[in-house]
């Protein structure tokens, strides 16, 4: 059967798609379906019904106004995760105590086992953070918020296996990213500047007036705000600007001690702390600085952490930042090479609204240039996250899985594990990064795993089923109302030859049309 399904899927993958037939009266148009697949991680019956009822503009407004809080059923699932029971300081207090116990043990097997147990606890924190992220991507009605959370996690990337980052991941996504995905870009940047995971990952926690570390300053300018100097965003900055920003950021670090530092009384009032984050004035360079031609005062009310806030405002309001962020959003949602006129519209909105992300998204999703892209049949190629989540949302629409470990493993196999990108640039979103023959073979295998049965998705930690499993049925009423007409003749012919539901599911989820939004 495996060989037969592979041949059917390969036939569809190698064939060119014919123009989709018109939508039957009363159903969602093909353009609207592709629009919805872009705004969400993948259409389901509920989102299709809502878009049909209210139209694009109202649907988008509702998505942008969805509360940050999860709906009750989803909130209950997330509350059951172990990471929900501890905040950062509590987790690190327990970690300090555990490390002290391990260090007190004599060298030998017991000490080694205790270390391995502690490492396992750290891996479980990462797994729980991944589960929480995937639960929301799969089941939250706030699909645009979840997509933007994924987008900004990539943009402000941290790597779980660097330093202490794994222990800080839960708060990074929950406090630094999710609350700000539709807000002012400046506030989002500021939240990441004070995020312990970011400060540990990019080494700013080690930076002090007498030993400045430029790593975070460089990435904050090049990857998070302005773009590469001299690049497409039009940014122009020098190594001197990087050094000045690094001086501004001295003292921005971590407090993993569990108690505040002892400070000179003259500087004590400048100390700030929030959870594991601290601004320690004893480590800050109070000399005058100039960033991108803007003078940053060295004394009075503007000294200390106020310098950091001013620097973030300077970076966030620079014209290069407006273009860099607008183009990156358009590259993720619209096309690898988005229409220049669309990017210009987004830049104008970003500038006019002082970086209002929600307003920029509204401009993008409702722009005539985007509508023309949809009408042309050109669609974004799915990265592994979108491929896996959209496949799950179709195959198990309305059914709650209890074990997300297989989904986590599928993303690992496809090369896009959550919190697993080593470099600070995050995962790419272009087709060229994800369309290799090896990637396609792995996608076929995962399509078969999703389409052939529950694949452990309804099992508990002991491997035993915890709920009525149900078989995935991708050819639902939603398929016939919306998806079928988007398929080319070769894919439809391959589906007609399928000899079982599992084979049919696998062919659909392996088809060239399904690889695009």
Task: Give the location of each predicted region.
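A general structural motif at alpha-helix termini
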Residues: 10, 52-55, 192, 364-365, ...
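N-terminal export leaders
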Residues: 1-7, 36
